[in-house]
């Protein structure tokens, strides 16, 4: 009987949210939007791609991601709306096709991480330092439309739940990392620094 009670108690926490995780994710679930900058890197076929990106994220609205560096592509913007993406440079616009949850591009890294915080299924939660800063580390699952396993892991600073780092893994391989350099919710002046 005691074993059954222990098993039933454990069942409630698998994939569910503890109070700490729910508290950390609540500002993201309730936000009207946020602005962030991050150093994003992608490793593919042994080659590393890195860029500084600025993202103006609007849940269920128009999200804009702009390349800040490297200089050779600075100013290129991606506009993401309802699963569609368009690349823009100055006054030119090029349809970039559908953003598939299985085919995550570096330009979609920051919006994907915010979406994961808002809607992903919590798999792991713990406390962990990131570069000597106490953080809540959350790993959430957003299984793709074609059943691909997409896991997003975020390190949120404990004192204010601001993201410091994010990683996106597809089918067990980390494909994108983001080191946040600034972050603020709409209507606040709360930089990450």
Question: Where would I find each of the regions flagged by the language model?
Answer:
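N-terminal leader/targeting segments and the immediate start of mature chains
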Residues: 4-62, 72, 187-193
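Extended beta-sheet lipid-handling architectures
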Residues: 35-38, 50, 78-82, 167-168, ...
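An acidic-aromatic
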Residues: 54-109, 176
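Solvent-exposed loop/turn segments connecting transmembrane beta-strands
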Residues: 45-48, 70-74, 146-147, 173-175
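Flexible, processing/modification-adjacent segments and terminal tails
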Residues: 29-30, 38-42, 74, 87-145
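Preference for bulky hydrophobic residues occupying beta-strand positions
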Residues: 38-40, 55, 78, 87, ...
């Amino acid at each position: 009987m005691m074993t059954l009670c222990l098993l039933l108690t454990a069942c409630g926490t698998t994939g569910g949210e503890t109070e700490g995780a729910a508290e950390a994710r609540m500002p993201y679930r309730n936000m009207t939007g946020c602005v962030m900058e991050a150093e994003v890197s992608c490793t593919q076929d042994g080659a590393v791609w890195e860029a500084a990106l600025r993202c103006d994220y609007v849940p269920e609205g128009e999200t804009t991601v702009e390349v800040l560096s490297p200089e050779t592509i600075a100013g290129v913007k991606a506009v993401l709306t309802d699963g569609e993406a368009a690349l823009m440079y100055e006054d030119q616009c090029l349809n970039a096709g559908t953003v598939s949850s299985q085919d995550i591009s570096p330009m979609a890294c920051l919006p994907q991480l915010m979406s994961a915080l808002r809607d992903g299924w919590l798999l792991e939660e713990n406390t962990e330092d990131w570069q000597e800063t106490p953080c809540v580390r959350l790993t959430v699952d957003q299984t793709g439309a074609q059943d691909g396993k997409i896991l997003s892991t975020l390190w949120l600073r404990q004192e204010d739940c601001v993201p410091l780092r994010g990683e996106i893994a597809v089918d067990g391989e980390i494909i994108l990392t983001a080191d946040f350099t600034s972050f603020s919710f709409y209507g606040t002046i709360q930089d990450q620094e």
